[in-house]
Design a protein with these regions (language model features):
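Gly/Ser-rich helix-loop-strand patches that form or flank binding pockets
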Residues: 43-92, 168-223
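Well-ordered alpha-helical segments embedded in enzymatic catalytic cores
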Residues: 13, 38, 112-116
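Short, small-residue-biased leader/transition segments that mark boundaries at the very start
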Residues: 2-6
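Extended alpha-helical "rod" scaffolds
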Residues: 129, 141-147, 161, 182, ...
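Short acidic/Ser/Thr-enriched loop-to-helix initiation segments
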Residues: 1, 67, 72-77, 89-130, ...
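Short helix-loop-beta junction
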Residues: 12-24, 118-124, 142-150
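A short, well-structured beta->alpha microelement
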Residues: 25-40, 134, 150-168
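Short, surface-exposed alpha-helical segments at coil->helix boundaries
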Residues: 8-12, 137
Length: 223
């Protein structure tokens, strides 16, 4: 009963907050013994294209940086997914550092996540710094021509040297890292180390992990 009251209060708060910004939020309730299963099923039933998840707050030793629920959702769904760890209000962020893997432009979900990130940066009024390979940079600069924002572009294609970002990032910066599921076009083996790097070297900054829509089958056994 107590959990149901908390659930209703959180949903009502979200609806009220959205209304205060002239947005409409449709609250959905789903009863399921498995939280990941519930979210995955709603994604399919409602035709959801974008998913925002907060980074879990694990207590003690956890087997996964992202958490078992998030890992399950990523493995069994194929929507643009943003995993967000907020350290400061987004309105106070001065720069968004966006790290993009090579061949990201070849993924089917490339235009979708680029538009989402671009809108957030544009609406925040903050500066963007994109780190990408030369080939990928061509596509990002095309977007820049169509929708100019305050931005810089820096060549980056060595994910084995990802920790140079710890020297680039400053206070009031948010770090965006575009990821990939295993065995997809833009996957790099060193991506498996990114969660550990973030946990160890970027504790003072907000960050967002972006998992784009990608070609290939997902495991639908829970749907």
């Amino acid at each position: 009963q107590r959990q149901m009251c908390i659930r209703d209060r959180v949903l009502n708060m979200a609806v009220t907050t959205a209304s205060a910004t002239d947005n409409v939020l449709q609250d959905l309730l789903r009863y399921d013994l498995n939280v990941a299963n519930a979210i995955i099923s709603v994604i399919k039933e409602q035709g959801i294209t974008d998913l925002v998840l907060g980074l879990h707050q694990g207590k003690g030793v956890v087997s996964s940086f992202l958490g078992n629920m998030t890992e399950a959702i990523l493995g069994q769904s194929n929507v643009t997914t943003l995993i967000y760890r907020p350290i400061q209000p987004i309105a106070t962020v001065k720069r968004h550092l966006v790290v993009v893997p090579a061949r990201a432009e070849k993924e089917v979900g490339f235009p979708m996540w680029v538009n989402k990130v671009w809108n957030i940066i544009h609406n925040s009024g903050a500066k963007a710094v994109f780190y990408a390979s030369e080939d990928t940079m061509v596509y990002l600069k095309e977007m820049y021509k169509k929708r100019p924002i305050e931005a810089e572009f820096s060549s980056f294609d060595d994910w084995d040297d990802f920790l140079i970002m710890s020297r680039e990032i400053k206070s009031d910066d948010t770090l965006w890292v575009v990821m990939s599921r295993r065995e997809r076009l833009s996957y790099h083996a060193n991506m498996s180390r990114i969660p550990n790097y973030l946990n160890k070297y970027f504790q003072s900054n907000s960050f967002v992990l972006v998992y784009p829509i990608q070609a290939g089958e997902t495991n639908n056994r829970y749907l």
